């Protein structure tokens, strides 16, 4: 797991789908105050197209690049795209936001954003990118053991994005067990689960 870098996949077709859903739910739920967004697998939180990880496989070419080059007349998709243009100051797209960046752009300063990342290098980048924001709290712990603590310390409506690397086979069981615990312990909680189907027959 600690060899994983989300930059390899940033902006690919799966990221586009995941972040479109995230932006839709952020806009829908943020009207319920107080509001907290929690990302226990935050990565670096934002990604440069010039970064060596994004350039290795260039997965963004079949993801966000295709979307940006397609004429789309849908208000919900435009909400997602507008945030990408916003972080790029409406200039040439050179930055693709991670979930943390999308949340920061979509939410208000009175909303709270909890970010967690175990990978030391990614955590360093996450802090560098977001620690100047007073409504963002950043931790460097095991995501599964820390998630319930982050939720318990939050007030009001909560949105959680559970998006592990799945490089460790046990991640599948850990996600399901985590959902069971969250469902039993917490109210006013919505969870987005990234759960790749790698083997159709098995899953």
What are these regions (language model features)?
Residues 1-203:
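Class I S-adenosyl-L-methionine-dependent methyltransferase catalytic core
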């Amino acid at each position: 797991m600690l060899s994983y870098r989300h930059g390899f996949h940033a902006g690919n077709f799966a990221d586009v789908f995941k972040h479109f859903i995230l932006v839709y739910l952020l806009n829908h739920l943020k009207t319920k105050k107080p509001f907290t967004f929690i990302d226990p697998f935050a990565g670096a939180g934002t990604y440069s197209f010039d970064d060596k990880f994004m350039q290795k496989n260039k997965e963004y070419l079949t993801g966000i690049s295709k979307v940006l080059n397609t004429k789309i007349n849908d208000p919900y998709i435009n909400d997602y795209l507008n945030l990408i243009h916003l972080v790029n100051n409406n200039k040439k797209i050179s930055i693709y936001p991670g979930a943390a960046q999308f949340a920061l752009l979509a939410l208000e300063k009175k909303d709270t954003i909890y970010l967690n990342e175990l990978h030391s290098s990614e955590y360093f980048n996450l802090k560098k990118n977001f620690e100047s924001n007073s409504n963002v709290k950043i931790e460097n712990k095991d995501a599964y053991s820390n998630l319930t603590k982050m939720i318990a310390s939050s007030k009001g409506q909560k949105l959680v994005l559970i998006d592990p690397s799945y490089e460790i086979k046990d991640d599948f069981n850990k996600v399901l067990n985590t959902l069971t615990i969250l469902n039993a312990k917490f109210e006013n909680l919505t969870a987005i689960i990234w759960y790749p189907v790698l083997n159709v027959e098995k899953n």
